[in-house]
Amino acid sequence: MCGIIGLFDIQNEEKMRQEALKMVRKIRHRGPDWSGSYSAKNCVLMHERLSIVDVEHGAQPLYDTKNQRVLAVNGEIYNHKKVAKNLKNSHDWKTHSDCEVLLYLYDEFGSDFLNDLDGIFAFCLYDPKTKDYFIARDHIGIVPLYIGWDKNGVTYVASEMKSIEAYCEKLQEFP
């Protein structure tokens, strides 16, 4: 069990980073092994890690250095080695994490790879070049994920509702 926080379409990076730090404290119990963060002009990602696969090198958020995409995941991709064999291009793998494959699947297939995954997961992927973000979770919804919006159009995503409920006008379980 890990914990993730994602804030998208933000206006004030420094202010929202500070708010995200408050949010992530509420889910710190989900990941005692590592706290990681990423912030940019339009996005903040936070991750609380419970180490299961690649204990030494799987710290998140994960980065695709070629495309500059960033990924925060709560979950486990059981068939990560199998789906990695479907990749046609060479990629600069940084870890042995089962989740890193999501960056490269997105690179090659866009969002059309979810049906190929066997696992339990919820993730936020951000592309700073296009300012696009991709949020998904496993088909059954085993891994919890919540999404909400504030009056300024900021999108909030979190592993636990309690971390974002004070910020959102509308809040729901991620479909």
Residue ranges and their predicted role:
Residues 1-175:
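Cysteine-centered catalytic environments shared across enzyme families
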